[in-house]
């Protein structure tokens, strides 16, 4: 019995490793984005709010890609904003998912004249320009509808794009329904930062245990957690990576030395300086 118990430990470690490193390695779409620097929520700065049309125009004009966040409104529109809670960006006590597009359209970002944009307004800015990195923000089990609506919108335009999400259900939906779309699993050290989640979920998300089922094309990890052992195994076995959020020239250089995509903000790419 002791022998069997001892054997279970390395067997479990091997199974964990297999689940973590199991991704797709041969997607041709990677070649379209592998040398791209993605502006985190657009090229926002003083007077130009994050995830605003102005920030995305600046990113497109600079030749960058852009990372953005998508939520579903109550009536099924695709709002581009990071937080579900609108207080930080719009100063109102409401959630994106509880408002209609018309109600959301009356709000302004950070007291500016910039409205909360919709995905159909952002995507055309990048046709013939840099690619988009679209993060799906699921709430209340709406992952399937969010995936479907987002892909319907993206298909209407000619911009290059890839999809990422913290929620493995989005990646599984993409694998089953749109396998041709480049997909990425977002992760971080949830054991340190997973407040409000069960220990089981925090462990599973940190270890990327769903990779064996969802088979992501890349993993996007918080820059500060880039040395997580299981992320190292992913990279060792040829897995592609992106790192967020890059805020200094030194971090940018380190990210690209590792061969990872950089999702950056507050860096002047022409001068190589932080803003």
Model-based region annotation:
Residues 2-275:
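Phosphate-group recognition and catalysis centered on beta-loop-alpha active-site segments
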């Amino acid at each position: 019995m002791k022998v069997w118990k001892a054997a279970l430990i390395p067997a479990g470690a091997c199974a964990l490793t297999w689940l973590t490193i199991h991704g797709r390695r041969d997607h041709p779409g990677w070649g379209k984005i592998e040398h791209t620097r993605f502006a985190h929520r657009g090229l926002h700065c003083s007077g130009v709010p994050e995830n605003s049309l102005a920030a995305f125009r600046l990113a497109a004009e600079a030749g960058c890609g852009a990372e953005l966040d998508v939520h579903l409104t109550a009536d099924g529109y695709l709002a581009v904003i990071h937080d579900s809670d609108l207080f930080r960006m719009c100063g109102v006590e409401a959630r994106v998912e509880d408002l209609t597009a018309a109600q959301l359209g009356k709000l302004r970002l950070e007291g500016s004249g910039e409205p909360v944009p919709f995905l159909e307004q952002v995507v055309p800015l990048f046709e013939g320009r840099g690619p988009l990195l679209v993060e799906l923000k699921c709430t209340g089990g709406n992952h399937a509808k969010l995936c479907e609506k987002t892909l319907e919108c993206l298909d209407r335009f000619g911009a290059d794009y890839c999809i990422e999400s913290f929620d493995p259900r989005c990646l599984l939906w993409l694998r089953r329904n749109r396998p041709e779309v480049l997909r990425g699993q977002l992760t971080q050290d949830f054991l340190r930062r997973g407040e409000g989640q069960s220990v089981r979920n925090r462990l599973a998300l940190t270890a990327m245990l769903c990779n064996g089922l969802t088979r992501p094309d890349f993993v996007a990890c918080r820059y500060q957690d880039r040395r997580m052992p299981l992320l190292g195994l992913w990279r060792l076995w040829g897995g592609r990576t992106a790192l967020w959020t890059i805020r200094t020239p030194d971090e940018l250089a380190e990210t690209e030395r590792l061969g990872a995509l950089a999702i950056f903000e507050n860096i002047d790419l022409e001068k190589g300086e932080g803003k």
